[in-house]
Design a protein with these regions (language model features):
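N-terminal Rossmann-fold NAD(P) dinucleotide-binding loop
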Residues: 12-13
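ATP-dependent carboxylate/acyl-activation modules
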Residues: 262-317
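Substrate-binding/catalytic subdomain of NAD(P)-dependent oxidoreductase enzymes
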Residues: 158, 169-265, 270
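NAD(P)-binding Rossmann-fold cofactor-contacting core
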Residues: 22-48
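Rossmann-fold NAD(P) dinucleotide-binding segment
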Residues: 58-95
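Glycine-rich Rossmann-fold phosphate-binding loop(s) that bind the pyrophosphate
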Residues: 8
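Rossmann-like NAD(P)H-binding beta-loop-alpha module
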Residues: 112-179, 185-190, 197
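Rossmann-fold NAD(P)-binding glycine/threonine-rich loop
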Residues: 78-88, 95-124, 129-132
């Protein structure tokens, strides 16, 4: 099977190394993985990838590929590359929640056909998209709450220790946790992208990103954090989806939760999701929600599903 990779940042490099490391799982199903090429911006840059892999700044190798793994990030450029490829009835594996959330007008038909695999788009290697697209469909969805952004988790944890917001944010940026500018994270938009993706499995298969009400953590003060602590509570940036009249209400906002709440006890560096259904009851998912190798593990898992003949993650119709 010939595979193409778009992007060679941390995630792209880890995908390539994990495919090599886990070669035996592909051998077990009788498949030999050949990397046709890796699309990059700078071919001269040093990278931690297996020897012998073609690195290029052109997309001509896509014609050879049975499946493409997209790790570029962004919206316009990956869509420009992937749309013609998807039109040729071939499959794409991606972790790109912004692309999925914002350009569903283009991508939905390919997802409905089973040609989009995107487990890693929400909570990275902690599996939530797979269960939502399969086993949880048997249960009537009622509500979800989730903490989905590691940068906000880090900043709020530092503020609990007495650091001002600006200082905690600067540290997060210095450590590489937050982008510069960090609005996508601290403004709640990264979380809103992920909530939009999940909503299409449990509420409305055409749920629009524009329907999410978004408020970030920029306005929180040490006084807010301390007042919550005195009352046995913590602030978290919470994504929430629940029934509202005949439709659905989706929000992202800072919320005070009891310290014993599952979203608080999951750990400062972990994502968490509380999923509620009439028949399945309350389910809790928790684990790493960011990082190169954990994201790569979900993407390589999607590759294995593709090779085994399983369809991609099909939303509600």
């Amino acid at each position: 099977m010939t595979v193409g990779v778009l992007g060679s940042g941390t995630v792209g490099q880890d995908v390539l190394n994990l495919i090599q490391k886990r070669k035996h799982i592909f051998d077990d199903i009788g498949v030999n993985i050949e990397i046709a090429g890796v699309l990059v911006r700078d071919v001269q840059k040093k990278r931690n990838i297996p020897d012998g892999i073609r690195v290029t700044d052109t997309c001509d190798f896509l014609q050879e590929c049975g499946v493409v793994i997209e790790t570029m990030g962004g919206v316009d450029r990956p869509l420009e590359i992937l749309h013609p490829y998807l039109r040729s009835h071939r499959s794409v594996i991606t972790a790109n929640k912004a692309l999925l959330a914002e350009r569903w007008d283009v991508l939905r038909e390919y997802a409905l056909d089973g040609n989009l695999y995107y487990e890693a788009s929400v909570m990275a290697g902690t599996p939530v998209i797979g269960p939502m697209s399969t086993v949880l469909r048997a249960s009537t969805f009622t509500r979800l709450q989730a903490v989905l952004n590691g940068t906000c988790n880090y900043i709020l944890t530092q503020m609990e220790g007495g650091k001002e917001y600006a200082q905690a944010l600067a540290e997060a940026q210095a450590l590489g946790y937050a982008e510069d500018p960090p609005t996508l994270d601290v403004g709640g938009f990264d979380t809103a992208h992920k909530l939009t993706v999940m909503a299409r499995f449990c509420a409305d298969g055409n749920f629009p990103y524009s329907a999410v009400e978004v408020q970030g953590i920029e306005g929180l003060t040490l006084a807010d954090i301390e007042d919550a602590r005195k009352n046995g509570e913590k602030y978290k940036l919470v994504a929430e989806l629940e029934r509202h009249g005949s439709g659905w209400k989706a929000t992202v906002a800072p919320k005070r939760l009891p310290e014993t709440h599952a979203l608080c006890t999951a750990g400062a560096s972990r994502n968490a999701l509380v999923y509620e259904g009439e028949e399945c009851g309350t389910l809790i998912f928790a684990g790493g929600g960011a990082g190169g190798m954990i994201t790569a593990s979900a993407m390589v898992g999607d590759l294995l599903d593709y090779l085994l003949g399983f369809p991609g993650h099909v939303p509600l119709h």
